Amino acid sequence: MYGPKNHGWIEVITGPMYSGKSEELIRRVRRVKIAKQKVQVFKPEIDNRYSNEDVVSHCGDKEGAVPIKSSEDILKLIKEDTEVVAIDEAQFFDKGILEVVNKIANEGKRVICAGLDQDFKGEPFGYMPDIIAVAEFVHKVQAVCMICGNPATRTQRLINGKPAKYDDPVVLVGAKESYEARCRKCHIVPKE
């Protein structure tokens, strides 16, 4: 995943909740710092589960981040000497995120995006499929199904312990109280 200096590219870390996406993003950011490269980390303001100003994995690892409202804010805040831009929870950003990550990569910077590829219905989530399509590197991670123990590729939303209905809102920020990892077979989305 390392190319020549001054050649930008996009890396995506994707999969369901509890698969280690933020943990992997944090690991890559730490390696960048060890290599003495300048890095900036961003996250959407809406992601305030564990911290307002850190990317935090479910296992407690954290890395400082700038919370932003809109993808355009990333372009306004990037410093000229920044070599690597890391973006967590990319699925929550507006349509402009695709143009933003392409612009940054085209300027010779490494872009690392982490986010859910599917929503709780098992459908493509936000603009993540678009980012995945233009990325040079895609790392799809799995969790463990909380029902059967098989590899989990989906996120099950639970409302009062029961699967959320298909027509429930797509965005509901939460953690263990409302979501769990499931495999294809154990993932349930009632139509009614």
UniProtKB/Swiss-Prot annotation:
Q: Mind telling me what this protein is named?
A: Thymidine kinase
Give the residues the record marks as binding ATP: 15-22, 88-91
Its assembly, as annotated, is: Homotetramer.
Q: What is its main location?
A: cytoplasm
Q: Spell out the catalytic residues.
A: 89 (proton acceptor)
Catalytic reactions on record: thymidine + ATP = dTMP + ADP + H(+)
Q: Has the keyword Cell wall biogenesis/degradation been applied to this entry?
A: no
Q: Which organism is it from?
A: Clostridium tetani (strain Massachusetts / E88)
Cellular component per GO? cytosol
Q: Which family does it belong to?
A: Belongs to the thymidine kinase family.
What's the domain of life for this entry?
A: Bacteria
Q: Where does Zn(2+) bind?
A: 145, 148, 183, 186
Tell me a GO biological process for this protein: DNA biosynthetic process
| First-level EC class | transferase
Q: Which UniProt keywords apply?
A: ATP-binding, Cytoplasm, DNA synthesis, Kinase, Metal-binding, Nucleotide-binding, Transferase, Zinc
- Compartment(s) of residence: Cytoplasm
**One GO molecular function term?**
thymidine kinase activity
The EC number on file is: 2.7.1.21
